[in-house]
Amino acid sequence: MSGFSRRELLIGGGLAAPTLMFPREGFSAAAFPAKNIQFIIPYAPGGGFDVYVRLIGPVMEKYLPNRVGIVPVNIAAGGGSRGVAQLYRAKPDGYSVGILNIPGMFILQQQQGTGAYDLSRFSWIGTMGEGERYAISVGAKSPMKSFADLKALSAKRPVKFSVTGPEGTAYAATMIGTQLLGIRPQLISGYKGSADYVIAAIRGDSDAVIAAIPTTLRFARGGQLRVLASFETHSSIPGVPDAAALGQPELDQISVERFVGAPPGLPAPTQNVLATALAKSLQDPVVVKWAKDNDLLMVPRAPDATAKLIAEQRAFFDKWRKYLVTG
């Protein structure tokens, strides 16, 4: 698995996963599951969310009470909204779960104005690892050597940032990050993936780029990027100023999370089985090795902690809605 090079396979790690406690509520392990479970991926095969499910799903099977399969189902349409809507409408029996991009789904729902699903009503199973924070970088050949240089450029003219389309979390990170840091942005948008818009900055098509730290580190280690600032509270990149040093603690709230959910109304005992299996899979030797090989941080979350996190994410991104919907 160490051959993957996508940004979703790299998360700065090193923390031990916490021990989770899930309520039993008198559940009989023999009752569920009795057949295969479909795992909805609202994106095309080969992307980061797809990779996560296809790696962790088979490991998760080992920790279910009965021997059944977890079957990935890609539903790539509407920027992810069709797959999420299908999951939302599925029968709440535990045989349909899905991976959701947060805040991507918040942003998409705000832009599309769809009422096909209510993200606050999903039955949450947990998360696939710790969320990715962001960093500001410039191409290695850029004359800018520090964050102060970037600010100085912004005082003269808007800074050109290469980004994805408005539906992407990188777009949101760039809009919110520049507002918090007082940088005047000029967005060059429409790049389809993280590699595309980062390479644009490396080529010099833009002045700078705000990308997830895993992606940033991959290019920085290759000598192609120079990191100027981290959005983490405490920078994982030596010598790089962080949110605390920049005086903007809210930067650490800009992240992309991989939530695992089920339809509204999932019975608590069934939710417990799925949540326990997911949490144990993240601590399985196979996943631990994969995470270590790819600088990943896999932190299990119980359903209540997951629901709390999604509420916090919603509140944060609602605060910045005007920048995300109108651009």
Enumerate the language-model features and the residues they cover:
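Short loop/turn segments at beta->alpha junctions
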Residues: 5, 79, 146, 192-193, ...
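N-terminal (or domain-start) structured segment
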Residues: 27-121, 170, 180-208, 219, ...
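N-terminal secretory signal peptides and thylakoid transit peptides that target proteins
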Residues: 1-16
